[in-house]
Amino acid sequence: MAPTDGAAPDGVDFYDRPVLAVAPALLGATVWHGPVAVRITEVEAYGGLDDPASHAYRGPTPRAAVMFGPPGRAYVYLSYGVHWCLNVVCGPVGSASAVLLRSGEVVAGRDLVAGRFPRLVEADLARGPGRLGRALAVTGALSGTTITGPGPVTVALAGGRGIRPPGPPGISGGRVRRGPRAGIRVATEWPWRFWLAGEATVSGPRPPRRPR
């Protein structure tokens, strides 16, 4: 199913930019696969050959070959033999950069997704990269496919166009937060995780809430 809110998938040029420019611009974007759509609330950037936490750090292995380009493609990998995780390839060909779509809110196909997670509350249906991948029913067969359309997975940016400073289109720059990446063992101090403040779907470590 194509996006139905009037926002079209952005072209390859949007993704042919540095990973730290693309990552926060994906916040608020809507990812479609079939009848299910997820609005992205949390992402992580991975810098390829210069990033020891990246799958591409040691070069173009069979698993990570997709990361080397072209940009605007899905990179889907199996985590711990259990969870399929969805990334978008960005940067010039050969830079091997990608953005992990870490968390989001299910905005279409809720009943279908809830059937996949019968014990979870709505905010948790796509909270975390494993659940997001399962909510969208992605598998390794989608790795390397275009996300700019036409294709099985499409990404429609908030507002439908590329980033306009100070933040993603349709998103107030003041809502975007930045901090260390989660769930990795190296380069843990790099502030390459971005999320939308005030979203219950965000999965990574967050500052404690103020007492009411």
Swiss-Prot record:
Molecular-function GO terms, alphabetical: alkylbase DNA N-glycosylase activity; DNA binding
CDD domains, sorted: AAG (cd00540)
Similarity-based family: Belongs to the DNA glycosylase MPG family.
Top-level lineage group: Bacteria
InterPro entries cross-referenced by the UniProt entry: Formyl_transferase-like_C_sf, MPG, MPG_sf
Protein name: Putative 3-methyladenine DNA glycosylase
HAMAP family tied to this protein: 3MGH
EC number: 3.2.2.-
PANTHER family for this protein: DNA-3-METHYLADENINE GLYCOSYLASE
GO terms, biological process: base-excision repair
UniProt keyword terms in alphabetical order: DNA damage, DNA repair, Hydrolase
